[in-house]
Amino acid sequence: MSNLIFSLNATMPIFLTMILGLFFRKVGILDESFTSKMNKFVFKIALPVLLFQDLSDSDFSAVWDIKFVLFCFFATLLSILAVWGLSHLLKERSARGEFIQAAYRSSAAILGIAFIQNIYGNSGMAPLMIISSVPLYNIMAVVVLAVFRPEREEITADFVKKTAKNIVTNPIILGIATGLLWSVLRIPKPVILQKTVQNIAVLATPLGLIAMGASFEAKSAAKNIRPSIAAAAIKLVGLAAVFLPIAVILGFRQEKLVAILVMLGSATTVSSFIMAKNMGHEGSLTANTVMLTTCGSAFTLTFWLYLMKTLAFI
């Protein structure tokens, strides 16, 4: 019973905060415009500042773990390749890009940090997990959505250059890189700067979760519902079932294992829908998968945490 309570204490506050966001949207406290701006603020300011704070305050040599970084990178890469292979079971070629992206692309930044903070009190290994997986998420999302685009256009040098620039200038990546550099150079932080950074960083998790909940659209879309269910099952259960045992065998425990779980088994990020629409896809498969995984992850993540706690891995 204590293990179940531990798991519920880790997951329920996260999802209740998201539900509050949905409630605030329904009663008119938040509207679409404000929610969009809140999402942008969290993505471009609060979340990078939080990551900068945690990394800049830590000893880089103690935080860096090449084994963990490589595992996250290759687990992400193999997950994408496996889902790409499975996508060929879909008859409609134009749906494959959405299926691949929705089945592998986690909300690693907001949910990952929220879970690890909720359990351990700080972002822990989340920044290293993010720097190993998020750039690959973005690169491969562009690739698969371009390759399986309904009105496919040639992938030119300018297209590749623009994509590379977007990845390098990603605010989350910049926050991590700046924090790591600050830690390596051991630059002192004046009290005024430290407190200002803390005041902004503390906004990231609650605002991010509220915005995620407020962005949720429970639209019923019969089209593509079966591949959406398949993508959700892969996202919440399949990838974690394959790679978590490998992570355990390799010796990952505690916050590292929780970070790996979130990378593999958390909900599909809402930004995947935005990217799919902006790259010429219809979007219903992605929207359905975001909806299913957001609802389902409240139960599946609780199950995974309960299982790992019972087995004394966390």
Question: Regions from the language model: what does each represent?
Answer:
Residues 1-314:
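Alpha-helical transmembrane segments of multi-pass small-molecule/ion transporters
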